[in-house]
Amino acid sequence: MELKNLAQTLLPRLVEIRRHLHAHPELSGQEYQTAAYVAGVLSSCGLHVEEAIGKTGVVGQLSGKGDDPRLLAIRTDMDALPIEEMVSLPFASRHPGVMHACGHDIHTTLGLGTAMVLSQMGHRLPGDVRFLFQPAEEIAQGASWMIQDGAMKGVSHILGVHVFPSIPAQQVGIRYGALTAAADDLEIFIQGESGHGARPHEAIDAIWIAAQVITALQQAISRTQNPLRPMVLSLGQISGGRAPNVIADQVRMAGTVRSLHPETHAQLPQWIEGIVANVCQTYGAKYEVNYRRGVPSVQNDAQLNKLLENAVREAWGESALQIIPEPSLGAEDFALYLEHAPGAMFRLGTGFGDRQMNHPLHHPRFEADEAAILTGVVTLSYAAWQYWQNIAI
């Protein structure tokens, strides 16, 4: 109850912080003012602050007074999106074409709020808490930058949070197992031979072969992949040809590949190349497949999930807890931290309960109910407070 009362007392300041961040969004890798603002708040709370971690990231370490060697990290992200805000708010974006349309202003506020609460309890914390304020989540590079600069050194476990407008504010969603998908980039080049549109038998039609490749890939997903292990392959770009009466000799396709299970993720490059090779060899074309690993799936740790569940129940009661039944095929570079320490990410509801529709993330009319701020800060604070008593080494 003491943590909750502290957070409640700080709420006006937290709303002020959130509105400042929302009005001053910065794109991925350009979070200079945001980082300086975050560092200033952390320093005022007495944390040890390191700036320029992961380029524009910030790390704040709160020292407990106990001797427990386990180090808990709490990660939030800071970057905005290249979207023109269409919500008429007194604190709407002041930067044309840039908007906090994914709630990272809320996330940053939650990290700062939790640091503010726990800093007032630091003399009673059994161990240390490290706060990671990450840049460039939207381009899936910030986590790797932070890790390369040592942000995860010594970390035992890590917690993360993401807002979710389809969950009502003042509710928390917990997902056991896979929360989000692995996301990779795919690029395919088809090389045929040009010819007159009236004489296709004298050419190798790269556009037609590309169509066969697309069809073969989609058919193979439904016939050769385990339907209980979801994956999605979406080709969102295709280009080729120079004139309507000339058979194209080159086609480029590009898209995204999403999967939930590590075993499926591991075999995708070879599986895709095999299908492309078979089609192209059948029709005499050459090909090139460029498969670029993005981020793996977020696989939540059961111990950390139970810690979050207990925190929600103790702070807010059973009615505030949702167990999420299905994962998302969206991606989150929080997964990269989980390659270095077990962890869990939860969904924080930001939906307005009195609205028929809450606009989704990445929408120019996305809006978050600020009641979520108290819920998120208290949940993270309770989880951190209980961490050393409930999580095994």
From Swiss-Prot:
Top EC category: hydrolase
GO molecular function, one term: hydrolase activity
Keywords of the record: Hydrolase
InterPro entries xref list: Amidohydrolase, Bact_exopeptidase_dim_dom, Peptidase_M20, Peptidase_M20_dimer
EC number in record: 3.-.-.-
Pfam families assigned to the protein according to its UniProt record, in alphabetical order: M20_dimer, Peptidase_M20
Family: Belongs to the peptidase M20 family.
Name this polypeptide is given: Probable hydrolase sll0100
Species assigned in the record: Synechocystis sp. (strain ATCC 27184 / PCC 6803 / Kazusa)
